Each structure stands twice: as C-alpha cells, then as structure tokens.
C-alpha cells in the first residue's frame, strides 16, 4: 500500500486516538462528526464541586453531532425497564443536546430516545434529565450517553443507570396514533 493510501487511514486513527485520550475512563466519543468535538473531565465543575464530563464543539460551525457514550451487554437487564439520568448544564447550544439511550437486538434498534422532542438548547443551569426504555427479552446491547448536535458545550454530572418499576413511563418510541383524522380544515395553527 502506498503512503498516500495509508495517509487517510492513519489520519482517521490518529483523530480517533486523540478524541479517546481525553474521554473519561469507560466512556468513548462517537457520532457522525466526533473529531469536531472534544471531551474531558472538569474536576470541580459539577454539582457540589464533583467532577463532571464535558462535551464541547471545536469549530465555529458544525453540520453533525458528537456523543460521549458507553455500551454494554443487555443480559442482566432483559425484560426490565431501565433509566439513564443525570444533571446537565449547557452553554451556547445552538441546535440541540440531550441524553440518549438505545437498545439493540443484534444490528436492529428495538428501543430509542435521544430527547430530540424535548431538547436542551441555549445556556442552562444544572437540570436533571432522564431517558427511560424497556429492554426486550431478546435484546443484545444497551447504549447511552450525552449528545451535542451543532455547536456549544454541555456538561454531565451525577450520571446514573438503573432498573426502574414499570409504573415509571417510558420516554422513547413513537407517539401513539390519534383515534381519527385531525385539523382537516387547517384552522388549528401551532
């Protein structure tokens, strides 16, 4: 293989390693533009002076997203309802940010929520957020994290993953279909 052909692969690997070097232990960077974001741990930036993870854009404009995430086997959560939660603060988020979680069966996603319907935008103080999903009996993997679409900065503190009772509603999935047609005369305006 020529040096020119190796260059793109080597460059991508170097970018990936740089991004991974700053990620907190047990976490990694991903997304469709992970090289456009940086992550790290702010030792005393969290609630009560506790460490928090940060995810920040590195460019003045980004068409895409980055995420700081974890993944693990679903085995011990099969048939359970689970919640990923944490306190998040944001600064200058122009598109949106949010916690997210996905449950897969093989290569197929069977449950998903990324808070896009209730996004974090702009500059906010610490607020508690959560995503809650059911893990089917045949699930194989669980993935979760914090994502930033476009530019800005977000911090995650006091992250928690737990089994919850079914009395706590899920946050993911498609909204239920209405019982019939609506607004056929277009008189209702958002």
Task: Kindly give the residue locations of the regions a language model identified.
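Extracellular and organelle-lumenal recognition/adhesion modules and their flexible linkers in secreted
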Residues: 20-190
């Amino acid at each position: 293989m020529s040096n020119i052909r190796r260059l793109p692969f080597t460059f991508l690997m170097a970018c990936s390693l740089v991004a991974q070097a700053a990620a907190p232990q047990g976490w990694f960077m991903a997304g469709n533009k992970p090289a456009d974001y940086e992550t790290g741990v702010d030792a005393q930036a969290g609630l009560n002076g506790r460490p928090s993870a940060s995810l920040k854009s590195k460019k003045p404009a980004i068409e895409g997203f980055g995420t700081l995430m974890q993944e693990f086997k679903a085995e011990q959560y099969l048939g359970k309802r689970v919640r990923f939660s944490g306190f998040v603060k944001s600064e200058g988020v122009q598109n949106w940010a949010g916690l997210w979680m996905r449950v897969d069966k093989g290569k197929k996603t069977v449950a998903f929520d990324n808070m896009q319907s209730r996004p974090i935008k702009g500059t906010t103080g610490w607020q508690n957020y959560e995503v809650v999903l059911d893990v089917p009996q045949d699930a194989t993997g669980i993935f979760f994290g914090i994502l930033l679409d476009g530019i800005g900065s977000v911090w995650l503190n006091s992250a928690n993953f737990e089994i919850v009772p079914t009395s706590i509603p899920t946050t993911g999935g498609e909204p239920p279909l209405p019982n019939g047609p609506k607004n056929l005369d277009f008189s209702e305006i958002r």
